[in-house]
């Protein structure tokens, strides 16, 4: 019966579930482990003891265009996951289980259910729904508190009206009972008082529960008083009143399911007990009690069918909203991490410009955009570690990366203190610029002080390691172009002839000395003592360019005094701040080094900076709940309605929102129709029990039953469509998925139930008893009273009619009203029908019923009942009256009570419909806003990751983003067989000139950008997926293959052949570029293979690189190569020759640091 479970089961779309556990599969091993043994990444801390690994939060669903290896990383780990805790919702499509960590998981219900399981699920329907987390349950109650408060206030007004109606019904006849009048007056006063209480600002959730139970107590008292005050008494007297009380207990009082069920059953039982005790001598007691039981059971069923889906929908909406907020916060947290990492690698102005270009779709241009800015009056410092090869040969991979990381992290700190911007780390070479991005007048002083500090730092390394290492520092002042080139693996860099000169100043310098040009000396203003540097004697370039150089001897006396005073001020500040700020450590978190203003400009709201420490201390669940709590406090229901929803119609003011809302599918629609069928069955049983049978009545009931059953079956196809023909599936989908069609079917079902409630009225005897008795007693019909009928020995319920006729007598028309009320209550089950639609339907049905009741033939049934009920009262009193002194009727005529009863029920039904629709629409609106914010965060995350993946390899970026708790860890890999390529444009330096005609060299860089972009596009091709671009160094392009398990082919060595193919492809591309740019660029490419160390150094500004003898030799293959040729080592020759590649021996070549080596030229790929 899967179609019926639609009522009991909250359908959850797997693609957008609010349960955090559905969308990800648990990873079988931690990030960083490899199946093979060639390359094992290690993460170590040089500053702290080892800590347990922090879990990676599960990512939310993402757009298809974000689908890449990094985004698809695993699911939730164990620990503090960002998953919603399960809520006990009774019947569901999924089993809710609890893991060892206490987190709820949801498993698909694919196993057939046993009878015991179905019974257990059925019992859960009647249980109160609540989240397993008490805090989450409190948030849910607060979430709906404002709506419940306004609904409770309106309910008090309806109950005041109800007490007024009851008072009028009781006081209108001649014999009102003071006790009952006093009871109703007190009840009305209490309801007014409670209405005032509900509107007070101090009204809280706990008070709402108290008010609800007080209302139930008052209703029970009114019900008892009404039964005792009934005159004449009857088991069906005032039957509509407990039906109304039971209905509002389920629908309008903000109480949980268990309390609603107990209240409904309690009120029903109370009326049955009173009817039994007060009418023991009634000949028709058990017949009417049986009908009453069916009537109350049906009312309770309607209440359950209304309360359960409404609460489940509300809780599901709350879950989904919380889920979107949770995903948004998670994405915001990830974006903040990405922004910090991004801004730690690229200057803010460059990163923002790139992000803006990604956000804005540009028209296709002839050239790729170049991100370059020109800066005059800067100083460039190049520093190289002399003796690094000796140091590296004595270190393991871990020790090498740790040493470099600590040393360059120290340099980064010194650069920040000396107002220098680190540009790049090239192996053991470090270079920075002062005067970027903001201009400084003392840029030369900053670089000189930076050089002094670097030499002091390397002396400490020399003392600790015992290895003779030192620094050569070269400085030049002039103009630079700064920015990034290419499409992938962006690295901020500087270019100009002055940068080239600064590089040669380092190469022509002396160990432990600072080598400067005259241009730099002029900016120093005599603050330093210098001596001739004679750089031309040590460097050919300096000699060719006739560069006059100097070596710094030390600061002048004036400069020493200024530095001493500055140091004293800094010590004073340090002493005053001691204990407030942490001491410097070499590898502090990059994620905490940037100003929040940059994050806001990049699209991340960092307004919570002041509370950052508190939020970092919260676990993810508590952070989501805290955010949701603040959002609930800030949310104004009245303002939301005013801004977005029309007051009476409850439709959205914006048509696009209304269209989106109308496309919402209610998967429980089949259950609503099934519930209407159940109400119809109860009505049939009541009428068969109370009223005489007729062939016409049975025929009508059979026809309605078939129509409703067919409707239910058609709607059920939507839940289990694969078992039915496709035409029937399409019909079912067209009904359930269309709000207009489902509304029409819902109204049709209610009309059928309504027809069953009134159809039997036309099969009863409509002859007025007054007319028959008047003929028998020779009186006018107006003179006939109950006493006259008593004299004729005719009373209520006699089968033999007083008047001649062929149609049966219907003695208890109160049950027609009861059935009519049930048919109206059945409309409340269809939660998807709009409140204005329900109001129109109730108005039309009520009008039809009143026209029949007041003007149609059935009116005589109610007149006859009022007269016979008086006879029944006289018989119960055992008194005899003649026709002249017969007592007046003790109650208002039933047909005049009916319009007022219908009005009270219509108000309650409309109030409930307004509450349901208003809640659904506001939930939809808030969820839509949360969804929009989440999607914006997803887009921002995608932009950030596209930028980030163009800077660091994906697994490296994953390390820095996922392991935020261990920001001081190192990342490195020892890889045993990696192919490395250096490809340089040998004559680009001849092409590069700085003239006004080419914008001081920018146009030359633009062409270089196009060349590198072409190389990047080629490396992005699928056949070169094993390759990883490392970086560009001026006009040299560096790439490698086999750096991780996914790209390393230990057996087939395909990663090596892929790099060889790429090198040949670059040669072809350079020929193509020369043809179209009318240039004659010549490329030299060097290839080598062997073990390398890959890792990241400088956690403040992480930079990925590879080191080792393999890298050095590959670079030498490029520098000692021949233009337009690809030079490879003997090791690589053996692999390529075995694969059929065409190579020729070049011979013996002298290689710096390696002596003589036999090399080969790669001429072509395998012959076909």
Swiss-Prot record:
Glycosylation (residues): 793
Tissue: Detected in peripheral blood mononuclear leukocytes (at protein level). Detected in thyroid.
Modified residue annotations for Phosphoserine: 54, 556, 576, 662
Post-translational modifications reported in the UniProt record: Phosphorylation by RAF1 increases enzyme activity. Phosphorylation by PKA at Ser-662 inhibits the GNAS-mediated increase in catalytic activity. Phosphorylation by PKC at Ser-556, Ser-662 and Thr-919 inhibits catalytic activity.
Activation/inhibition comment: Activated by G(s) G alpha protein GNAS. Inhibited by G(i) G alpha protein GNAI1. Is further activated by the complex formed by GNB1 and GNG2. Activated by forskolin. Inhibited by calcium ions, already at micromolar concentrations. Inhibited by adenosine, AMP and their analogs. Phosphorylation by RAF1 results in its activation.
Major place of residence: membrane
GO molecular-function terms, A-Z: adenylate cyclase activity; ATP binding; metal ion binding; protein kinase binding; protein kinase C binding
Residues on Extracellular side: 760-819
PTM annotation (Phosphothreonine): residues: 919
Cofactor(s) this protein requires: Mg(2+); Mn(2+)
Residue intervals passing through the bilayer: 152-168, 181-197, 214-230, 239-255, 259-275, 289-305, 674-691, 702-718, 743-759, 820-836, 839-855, 897-913
Residues exposed to the Cytoplasmic side: 1-151, 306-673, 914-1168
Alphabetical keyword list: ATP-binding, cAMP biosynthesis, Cell membrane, Cell projection, Cilium, Disease variant, Glycoprotein, Lyase, Magnesium, Manganese, Membrane, Metal-binding, Nucleotide-binding, Phosphoprotein, Repeat, Transmembrane, Transmembrane helix
One biological process term in Gene Ontology: cellular response to catecholamine stimulus
Catalytic activity: ATP = 3',5'-cyclic AMP + diphosphate
Entry EC number(s): 4.6.1.1
Binding site for ATP: 384-389, 426-428, 472, 1031, 1105-1107, 1112-1116, 1152
Binding, Mg(2+) 1: 384, 428
UniProt binding sites for Mg(2+) 2: 384-385, 428
UniProt family annotation: Belongs to the adenylyl cyclase class-4/guanylyl cyclase family.
Stated role: Catalyzes the formation of the signaling molecule cAMP downstream of G protein-coupled receptors. Functions in signaling cascades downstream of beta-adrenergic receptors in the heart and in vascular smooth muscle cells. Functions in signaling cascades downstream of the vasopressin receptor in the kidney and has a role in renal water reabsorption. Functions in signaling cascades downstream of PTH1R and plays a role in regulating renal phosphate excretion.
Description of its domains: The protein contains two modules with six transmembrane helices each; both are required for catalytic activity. Isolated N-terminal or C-terminal guanylate cyclase domains have no catalytic activity, but when they are brought together, enzyme activity is restored. The active site is at the interface of the two domains. Both contribute substrate-binding residues, but the catalytic metal ions are bound exclusively via the N-terminal guanylate cyclase domain.
Protein name per UniProt: Adenylate cyclase type 6
Organism name: Homo sapiens
